Protein backbone atom coordinates (compact mmCIF):
# COMPACT_ATOMS: atom_id res chain seq x y z
CA UNK A 1 0.00 0.00 0.00
CA UNK A 2 1.23 3.50 -0.81
CA UNK A 3 1.81 6.07 1.91
CA UNK A 4 1.99 9.85 1.66
CA UNK A 5 2.39 12.94 3.76
CA UNK A 6 -0.51 15.15 2.78
CA UNK A 7 -0.54 18.89 3.45
CA UNK A 8 -3.80 20.62 4.33
CA UNK A 9 -3.35 24.36 3.91
CA UNK A 10 -5.52 26.99 5.54
CA UNK A 11 -7.62 29.04 3.16
CA UNK A 12 -7.09 32.69 4.11
CA UNK A 13 -10.35 34.25 5.31
CA UNK A 14 -12.05 37.42 3.99
CA UNK A 15 -11.08 39.48 7.08
CA UNK A 16 -7.29 39.02 6.77
CA UNK A 17 -5.86 42.14 8.45
CA UNK A 18 -2.84 43.45 10.34
CA UNK A 19 -3.96 44.21 13.88
CA UNK A 20 -0.72 43.21 15.67
CA UNK A 21 -2.48 40.76 17.98
CA UNK A 22 0.31 38.27 18.64
CA UNK A 23 2.63 39.32 21.46
CA UNK A 24 5.87 37.36 21.05
CA UNK A 25 5.55 37.27 17.26
CA UNK A 26 7.92 39.94 15.96
CA UNK A 27 6.44 40.19 12.45
CA UNK A 28 2.88 40.44 13.75
CA UNK A 29 3.74 43.32 16.07
CA UNK A 30 6.05 45.20 13.72
CA UNK A 31 3.51 45.21 10.87
CA UNK A 32 0.51 46.26 12.97
CA UNK A 33 -1.77 48.76 11.22
CA UNK A 34 -0.54 47.98 7.69
CA UNK A 35 -3.26 47.88 5.05
CA UNK A 36 -3.89 44.24 4.14
CA UNK A 37 -5.02 42.67 0.88
CA UNK A 38 -7.26 39.67 1.68
CA UNK A 39 -7.69 38.80 -2.00
CA UNK A 40 -3.92 38.67 -2.60
CA UNK A 41 -3.37 36.72 0.63
CA UNK A 42 -5.88 34.04 -0.33
CA UNK A 43 -4.47 33.77 -3.85
CA UNK A 44 -0.87 33.49 -2.60
CA UNK A 45 -1.94 30.58 -0.41
CA UNK A 46 -3.83 28.91 -3.23
CA UNK A 47 -0.84 29.29 -5.57
CA UNK A 48 1.45 27.53 -3.10
CA UNK A 49 -1.06 24.73 -2.51
CA UNK A 50 -1.64 24.23 -6.24
CA UNK A 51 2.10 24.16 -6.95
CA UNK A 52 2.54 21.30 -4.47
CA UNK A 53 -0.43 19.43 -5.93
CA UNK A 54 1.11 19.84 -9.40
CA UNK A 55 4.31 18.25 -8.07
CA UNK A 56 2.29 15.14 -7.25
CA UNK A 57 1.79 15.86 -3.55
CA UNK A 58 -1.49 15.07 -1.80
CA UNK A 59 -2.71 18.59 -1.04
CA UNK A 60 -5.91 19.65 0.68
CA UNK A 61 -7.50 22.87 1.89
CA UNK A 62 -9.07 23.66 5.25
CA UNK A 63 -11.84 26.24 5.42
CA UNK A 64 -11.35 29.48 7.39
CA UNK A 65 -13.25 30.52 10.52
CA UNK A 66 -16.30 32.74 10.53
CA UNK A 67 -15.20 36.32 11.18
CA UNK A 68 -16.26 38.78 12.51
CA UNK A 69 -17.11 36.45 15.41
CA UNK A 70 -20.31 38.08 16.61
CA UNK A 71 -21.08 35.19 18.96
CA UNK A 72 -17.99 35.93 21.05
CA UNK A 73 -18.78 39.66 21.02
CA UNK A 74 -22.29 38.91 22.29
CA UNK A 75 -20.89 36.57 24.95
CA UNK A 76 -18.88 39.47 26.36
CA UNK A 77 -21.82 41.84 26.55
CA UNK A 78 -22.29 43.63 23.24
CA UNK A 79 -25.92 43.53 22.12
CA UNK A 80 -28.50 44.69 19.62
CA UNK A 81 -28.40 44.18 15.87
CA UNK A 82 -25.28 42.73 14.26
CA UNK A 83 -24.37 46.21 13.02
CA UNK A 84 -24.82 47.63 16.51
CA UNK A 85 -22.63 44.93 18.05
CA UNK A 86 -19.79 45.93 15.70
CA UNK A 87 -20.36 49.63 16.29
CA UNK A 88 -20.38 49.22 20.10
CA UNK A 89 -17.28 47.05 20.10
CA UNK A 90 -15.38 49.42 17.80
CA UNK A 91 -16.18 52.34 20.08
CA UNK A 92 -15.74 50.72 23.51
CA UNK A 93 -13.21 47.91 22.96
CA UNK A 94 -11.49 48.09 19.56
CA UNK A 95 -8.84 45.50 20.50
CA UNK A 96 -11.59 43.00 21.34
CA UNK A 97 -13.19 43.68 17.97
CA UNK A 98 -9.83 43.14 16.29
CA UNK A 99 -9.45 39.81 18.10
CA UNK A 100 -12.88 38.73 16.89
CA UNK A 101 -12.01 39.59 13.27
CA UNK A 102 -8.65 37.83 12.97
CA UNK A 103 -8.03 35.51 10.02
CA UNK A 104 -5.36 33.65 12.01
CA UNK A 105 -6.98 30.26 11.32
CA UNK A 106 -5.10 30.40 7.98
CA UNK A 107 -2.12 29.03 9.95
CA UNK A 108 -3.33 25.45 10.15
CA UNK A 109 -0.08 24.30 11.73
CA UNK A 110 -1.87 25.53 14.87
CA UNK A 111 -5.20 23.91 14.03
CA UNK A 112 -4.42 20.55 15.62
CA UNK A 113 -1.89 17.86 16.42
CA UNK A 114 -2.13 14.83 14.14
CA UNK A 115 -0.80 11.32 14.77
CA UNK A 116 -0.85 8.87 11.84
CA UNK A 117 -2.32 5.39 12.09
CA UNK A 118 1.14 3.78 11.91
CA UNK A 119 1.91 5.23 15.38
CA UNK A 120 -1.38 4.74 17.26
CA UNK A 121 -2.57 1.70 19.23
CA UNK A 122 -5.99 1.59 17.54
CA UNK A 123 -4.54 2.01 14.04
CA UNK A 124 -6.53 5.18 13.35
CA UNK A 125 -5.44 8.71 12.46
CA UNK A 126 -5.91 10.92 15.54
CA UNK A 127 -6.71 14.65 15.58
CA UNK A 128 -6.74 16.96 18.62
CA UNK A 129 -7.62 20.61 17.91
CA UNK A 130 -5.26 23.01 19.68
CA UNK A 131 -6.86 25.10 22.43
CA UNK A 132 -4.59 28.12 21.68
CA UNK A 133 -5.36 29.61 25.11
CA UNK A 134 -2.37 31.96 25.10
CA UNK A 135 -3.90 34.36 22.57
CA UNK A 136 -7.48 35.63 22.79
CA UNK A 137 -7.94 35.87 19.03
CA UNK A 138 -6.92 32.23 18.60
CA UNK A 139 -8.60 30.82 21.71
CA UNK A 140 -12.00 31.29 20.03
CA UNK A 141 -11.08 28.92 17.17
CA UNK A 142 -11.06 25.32 18.53
CA UNK A 143 -14.77 24.40 18.38
CA UNK A 144 -15.11 25.45 14.75
CA UNK A 145 -11.71 23.91 13.97
CA UNK A 146 -12.99 20.60 15.32
CA UNK A 147 -16.09 20.81 13.12
CA UNK A 148 -14.04 21.65 10.02
CA UNK A 149 -11.61 18.78 10.69
CA UNK A 150 -14.48 16.34 11.25
CA UNK A 151 -16.14 17.48 7.99
CA UNK A 152 -12.83 17.03 6.16
CA UNK A 153 -11.80 13.72 7.75
CA UNK A 154 -15.28 12.34 8.32
CA UNK A 155 -15.03 8.54 8.16
CA UNK A 156 -14.90 7.18 11.76
CA UNK A 157 -13.47 3.90 10.47
CA UNK A 158 -10.20 5.73 9.74
CA UNK A 159 -10.25 8.98 11.73
CA UNK A 160 -10.49 9.55 15.50
CA UNK A 161 -11.32 13.12 16.56
CA UNK A 162 -10.72 14.39 20.11
CA UNK A 163 -11.94 17.53 21.85
CA UNK A 164 -9.37 20.25 22.52
CA UNK A 165 -7.60 20.17 25.90
CA UNK A 166 -8.98 22.05 28.95
CA UNK A 167 -8.86 25.81 28.39
CA UNK A 168 -6.25 26.64 31.00
CA UNK A 169 -2.63 27.78 30.74
CA UNK A 170 -1.47 24.53 32.34
CA UNK A 171 -2.60 22.84 29.13
CA UNK A 172 -1.54 25.54 26.67
CA UNK A 173 -1.47 23.74 23.33
CA UNK A 174 -0.46 25.22 19.97
CA UNK A 175 -0.85 22.11 17.85
CA UNK A 176 1.43 20.87 15.10
CA UNK A 177 3.58 24.03 15.20
CA UNK A 178 5.27 22.37 18.20
CA UNK A 179 5.19 18.82 16.85
CA UNK A 180 7.04 16.98 14.12
CA UNK A 181 7.49 13.35 13.21
CA UNK A 182 10.57 11.44 12.13
CA UNK A 183 10.31 8.09 10.35
CA UNK A 184 11.92 5.93 7.71
CA UNK A 185 8.84 5.74 5.47
CA UNK A 186 5.57 7.59 6.12
CA UNK A 187 3.72 4.29 6.56
CA UNK A 188 6.17 2.93 9.14
CA UNK A 189 5.92 3.64 12.86
CA UNK A 190 7.92 6.75 13.65
CA UNK A 191 8.99 8.94 16.54
CA UNK A 192 6.83 11.97 17.30
CA UNK A 193 8.73 14.97 18.66
CA UNK A 194 6.69 17.09 21.06
CA UNK A 195 8.40 20.42 21.72
CA UNK A 196 7.29 22.48 24.72
CA UNK A 197 8.21 25.87 26.14
CA UNK A 198 7.71 25.26 29.84
CA UNK A 199 6.49 22.87 32.52
CA UNK A 200 3.38 24.50 33.95
CA UNK A 201 3.41 22.48 37.17
CA UNK A 202 7.12 22.94 37.93
CA UNK A 203 7.87 26.55 38.97
CA UNK A 204 11.61 25.79 39.13
CA UNK A 205 11.90 24.56 35.54
CA UNK A 206 13.46 26.83 32.89
CA UNK A 207 11.09 29.17 31.07
CA UNK A 208 11.31 32.37 29.00
CA UNK A 209 11.32 35.73 30.78
CA UNK A 210 10.18 38.19 28.09
CA UNK A 211 7.66 36.38 25.91
CA UNK A 212 5.19 33.64 26.85
CA UNK A 213 5.88 29.94 26.37
CA UNK A 214 2.70 28.96 24.58
CA UNK A 215 3.12 25.17 24.80
CA UNK A 216 3.39 23.23 28.06
CA UNK A 217 4.88 19.80 28.66
CA UNK A 218 1.60 18.87 30.33
CA UNK A 219 -0.33 19.62 27.13
CA UNK A 220 2.09 17.67 24.95
CA UNK A 221 1.90 14.64 27.22
CA UNK A 222 -1.91 14.82 27.28
CA UNK A 223 -2.06 14.80 23.47
CA UNK A 224 0.32 11.82 23.35
CA UNK A 225 -2.00 9.93 25.74
CA UNK A 226 -5.12 10.83 23.76
CA UNK A 227 -3.48 9.65 20.56
CA UNK A 228 -2.64 6.27 22.08
CA UNK A 229 1.09 6.63 21.46
CA UNK A 230 3.61 4.32 23.09
CA UNK A 231 6.52 5.78 25.05
CA UNK A 232 8.87 4.45 22.37
CA UNK A 233 7.05 6.60 19.79
CA UNK A 234 7.50 9.89 21.69
CA UNK A 235 10.31 12.28 22.54
CA UNK A 236 9.52 15.40 24.60
CA UNK A 237 12.00 18.23 24.01
CA UNK A 238 12.13 21.64 25.65
CA UNK A 239 12.60 24.59 23.34
CA UNK A 240 15.39 26.91 24.44
CA UNK A 241 13.70 29.69 26.50
CA UNK A 242 16.29 32.19 25.25
CA UNK A 243 15.13 31.81 21.64
CA UNK A 244 11.47 32.19 22.66
CA UNK A 245 12.54 35.54 24.12
CA UNK A 246 14.06 36.40 20.72
CA UNK A 247 10.76 35.92 18.90
CA UNK A 248 10.70 32.15 18.32
CA UNK A 249 7.12 31.76 19.51
CA UNK A 250 6.62 28.25 18.04
CA UNK A 251 9.11 25.49 17.40
CA UNK A 252 8.36 25.62 13.67
CA UNK A 253 10.13 29.00 13.63
CA UNK A 254 13.42 27.33 14.64
CA UNK A 255 13.18 23.66 13.50
CA UNK A 256 11.44 21.46 10.93
CA UNK A 257 11.54 17.73 10.28
CA UNK A 258 10.59 15.32 7.51
CA UNK A 259 11.09 11.55 7.38
CA UNK A 260 14.71 10.98 8.46
CA UNK A 261 15.76 14.66 8.49
CA UNK A 262 15.66 17.12 11.39
CA UNK A 263 16.68 20.63 10.31
CA UNK A 264 17.19 22.95 13.27
CA UNK A 265 19.17 25.90 14.62
CA UNK A 266 21.93 25.11 17.10
CA UNK A 267 20.13 27.21 19.74
CA UNK A 268 16.70 25.62 19.15
CA UNK A 269 16.55 23.18 22.08
CA UNK A 270 17.73 22.52 25.60
CA UNK A 271 19.85 19.38 26.14
CA UNK A 272 20.09 18.92 22.38
CA UNK A 273 22.61 16.07 22.29
CA UNK A 274 20.79 14.11 25.00
CA UNK A 275 17.56 14.34 23.01
CA UNK A 276 19.25 13.41 19.72
CA UNK A 277 20.60 10.31 21.44
CA UNK A 278 17.06 9.46 22.61
CA UNK A 279 15.70 9.86 19.06
CA UNK A 280 18.44 7.56 17.73
CA UNK A 281 17.59 4.99 20.39
CA UNK A 282 13.91 5.04 19.52
CA UNK A 283 14.18 5.21 15.73
CA UNK A 284 16.40 2.60 14.14
CA UNK A 285 17.08 4.16 10.75
CA UNK A 286 19.68 6.40 9.12
CA UNK A 287 19.01 9.91 10.43
CA UNK A 288 20.25 13.31 9.27
CA UNK A 289 20.49 15.97 11.97
CA UNK A 290 21.19 19.22 10.11
CA UNK A 291 22.24 21.76 12.74
CA UNK A 292 22.58 25.34 11.51
CA UNK A 293 25.26 27.22 13.47
CA UNK A 294 24.70 30.74 14.79
CA UNK A 295 27.93 31.77 13.03
CA UNK A 296 26.20 31.16 9.69
CA UNK A 297 22.61 32.20 10.51
CA UNK A 298 21.86 34.40 13.52
CA UNK A 299 18.58 33.89 15.37
CA UNK A 300 17.40 37.30 14.17
CA UNK A 301 17.96 36.31 10.53
CA UNK A 302 16.24 32.97 11.06
CA UNK A 303 13.18 34.72 12.52
CA UNK A 304 13.05 37.50 9.91
CA UNK A 305 13.41 35.15 6.94
CA UNK A 306 11.55 32.17 8.45
CA UNK A 307 14.32 29.83 7.33
CA UNK A 308 12.90 27.09 9.55
CA UNK A 309 9.26 27.88 8.86
CA UNK A 310 9.83 26.16 5.55
CA UNK A 311 8.25 22.93 4.43
CA UNK A 312 10.49 19.95 3.81
CA UNK A 313 8.60 17.63 1.48
CA UNK A 314 9.40 14.34 -0.21
CA UNK A 315 8.31 14.36 -3.84
CA UNK A 316 6.84 11.21 -5.45
CA UNK A 317 10.28 10.73 -7.07
CA UNK A 318 11.77 10.35 -3.57
CA UNK A 319 13.66 13.65 -3.81
CA UNK A 320 13.49 15.86 -0.72
CA UNK A 321 12.78 19.55 -1.32
CA UNK A 322 12.54 22.68 0.85
CA UNK A 323 9.59 25.01 0.20
CA UNK A 324 10.74 28.45 1.38
CA UNK A 325 9.34 31.98 1.40
CA UNK A 326 10.99 34.46 -0.98
CA UNK A 327 12.13 36.29 2.17
CA UNK A 328 14.85 33.60 2.44
CA UNK A 329 16.20 34.67 -0.95
CA UNK A 330 16.24 38.30 0.18
CA UNK A 331 18.31 37.63 3.31
CA UNK A 332 21.98 37.26 2.25
CA UNK A 333 23.06 35.03 5.16
CA UNK A 334 20.06 32.72 4.82
CA UNK A 335 20.26 32.52 1.03
CA UNK A 336 23.97 31.69 1.25
CA UNK A 337 23.26 28.97 3.81
CA UNK A 338 20.50 27.37 1.72
CA UNK A 339 22.79 27.30 -1.32
CA UNK A 340 25.47 25.66 0.81
CA UNK A 341 22.96 23.14 2.20
CA UNK A 342 22.34 21.78 -1.29
CA UNK A 343 26.04 20.85 -1.57
CA UNK A 344 26.07 18.89 1.70
CA UNK A 345 25.55 15.15 2.03
CA UNK A 346 21.86 15.28 3.00
CA UNK A 347 18.64 14.12 1.29
CA UNK A 348 17.66 17.77 0.58
CA UNK A 349 18.42 18.47 -3.08
CA UNK A 350 16.38 21.53 -4.05
CA UNK A 351 14.89 24.75 -2.64
CA UNK A 352 11.68 26.17 -4.12
CA UNK A 353 10.74 29.77 -3.29
CA UNK A 354 7.17 31.07 -2.95
CA UNK A 355 5.78 34.54 -2.36
CA UNK A 356 3.57 34.37 0.75
CA UNK A 357 4.26 37.94 1.89
CA UNK A 358 0.71 38.71 3.04
CA UNK A 359 1.03 35.83 5.51
CA UNK A 360 4.68 36.56 6.35
CA UNK A 361 3.86 40.13 7.38
CA UNK A 362 1.49 38.71 9.98
CA UNK A 363 4.11 36.26 11.22
CA UNK A 364 3.37 33.06 9.30
CA UNK A 365 5.51 31.35 6.65
CA UNK A 366 4.89 28.31 4.43
CA UNK A 367 5.00 25.83 7.33
CA UNK A 368 2.46 27.84 9.35
CA UNK A 369 0.01 27.58 6.47
CA UNK A 370 -0.15 23.79 6.43
CA UNK A 371 -1.23 20.89 8.62
CA UNK A 372 0.68 17.70 7.84
CA UNK A 373 -1.24 14.43 7.75
CA UNK A 374 0.70 11.21 7.03
CA UNK A 375 -1.75 8.82 5.37
CA UNK A 376 -2.09 5.64 3.36
CA UNK A 377 -4.07 5.46 0.12
CA UNK A 378 -7.19 4.05 1.83
CA UNK A 379 -7.18 6.99 4.26
CA UNK A 380 -6.72 9.48 1.42
CA UNK A 381 -9.72 7.88 -0.33
CA UNK A 382 -11.75 8.34 2.89
CA UNK A 383 -11.05 12.09 3.04
CA UNK A 384 -13.78 14.49 1.85
CA UNK A 385 -12.66 14.60 -1.79
CA UNK A 386 -14.09 18.10 -2.28
CA UNK A 387 -11.31 19.46 -0.04
CA UNK A 388 -8.45 18.03 -2.14
CA UNK A 389 -6.62 20.40 -4.47
CA UNK A 390 -6.89 19.80 -8.22
CA UNK A 391 -7.38 21.94 -11.33
CA UNK A 392 -11.13 22.20 -10.80
CA UNK A 393 -10.97 23.19 -7.12
CA UNK A 394 -8.16 25.66 -7.79
CA UNK A 395 -10.19 27.38 -10.50
CA UNK A 396 -13.36 27.38 -8.42
CA UNK A 397 -11.69 28.78 -5.30
CA UNK A 398 -9.95 31.52 -7.29
CA UNK A 399 -13.31 32.57 -8.75
CA UNK A 400 -14.82 32.42 -5.26
CA UNK A 401 -12.06 34.70 -3.92
CA UNK A 402 -12.50 37.13 -6.83
CA UNK A 403 -16.23 37.27 -6.14
CA UNK A 404 -16.18 37.75 -2.37
CA UNK A 405 -12.85 39.21 -1.16
CA UNK A 406 -11.75 42.80 -0.80
CA UNK A 407 -8.33 43.88 -2.07
CA UNK A 408 -7.87 46.39 0.74
CA UNK A 409 -8.73 46.13 4.43
CA UNK A 410 -7.74 48.33 7.38
CA UNK A 411 -8.49 47.75 11.05
CA UNK A 412 -11.02 50.60 10.79
CA UNK A 413 -12.90 48.60 8.15
CA UNK A 414 -13.55 45.81 10.66
CA UNK A 415 -16.45 47.85 12.08
CA UNK A 416 -18.19 47.92 8.69
CA UNK A 417 -21.45 45.89 8.99
CA UNK A 418 -21.18 45.04 5.29
CA UNK A 419 -18.15 42.89 6.18
CA UNK A 420 -20.44 40.51 8.13
CA UNK A 421 -22.68 40.03 5.10
CA UNK A 422 -19.73 39.61 2.72
CA UNK A 423 -18.00 37.10 4.99
CA UNK A 424 -21.08 34.99 5.70
CA UNK A 425 -22.13 34.95 2.05
CA UNK A 426 -18.63 33.79 1.08
CA UNK A 427 -18.43 31.09 3.75
CA UNK A 428 -21.92 29.79 3.05
CA UNK A 429 -20.94 29.32 -0.59
CA UNK A 430 -17.62 27.75 0.44
CA UNK A 431 -19.32 25.07 2.53
CA UNK A 432 -21.25 24.10 -0.60
CA UNK A 433 -18.12 24.06 -2.78
CA UNK A 434 -16.23 21.90 -0.27
CA UNK A 435 -19.31 19.90 0.90
CA UNK A 436 -18.64 20.66 4.57
CA UNK A 437 -22.18 20.90 5.87
CA UNK A 438 -23.12 23.44 8.55
CA UNK A 439 -19.75 24.01 10.25
CA UNK A 440 -20.35 27.69 11.03
CA UNK A 441 -22.39 29.09 13.88
CA UNK A 442 -24.52 31.27 11.58
CA UNK A 443 -25.59 28.12 9.70
CA UNK A 444 -26.67 26.20 12.80
UniProtKB/Swiss-Prot annotation:
Substrate binds at residues 19-28, 110, 137-138, 214, 252, 362. One of its GO terms (molecular function) is N-succinylarginine dihydrolase activity. The active site is at 174, 250, 368 (nucleophile). Transmembrane segments: none annotated. It comes from the Bacteria. Catalyzes the hydrolysis of N(2)-succinylarginine into N(2)-succinylornithine, ammonia and CO(2). PANTHER family: N-SUCCINYLARGININE DIHYDROLASE. This is N-succinylarginine dihydrolase. The lineage of its organism: Bacteria, Pseudomonadati, Pseudomonadota, Gammaproteobacteria, Alteromonadales. The gene is astB.
Amino acid sequence: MKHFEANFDGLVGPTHNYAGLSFGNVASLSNAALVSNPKAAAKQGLQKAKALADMGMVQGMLAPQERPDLYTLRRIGFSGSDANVLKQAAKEAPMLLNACCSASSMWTANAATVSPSADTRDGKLHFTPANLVDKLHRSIEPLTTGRILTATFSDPHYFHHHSHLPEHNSFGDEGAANHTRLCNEYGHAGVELFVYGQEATNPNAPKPQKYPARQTLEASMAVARLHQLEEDNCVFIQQNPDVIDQGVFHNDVIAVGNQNVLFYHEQAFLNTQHKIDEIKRKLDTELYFIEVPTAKVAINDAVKSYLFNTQIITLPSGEMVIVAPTDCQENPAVFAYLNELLTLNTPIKQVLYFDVKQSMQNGGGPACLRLRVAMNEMEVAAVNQHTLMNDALFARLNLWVDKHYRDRLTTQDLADPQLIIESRTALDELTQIMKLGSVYQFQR
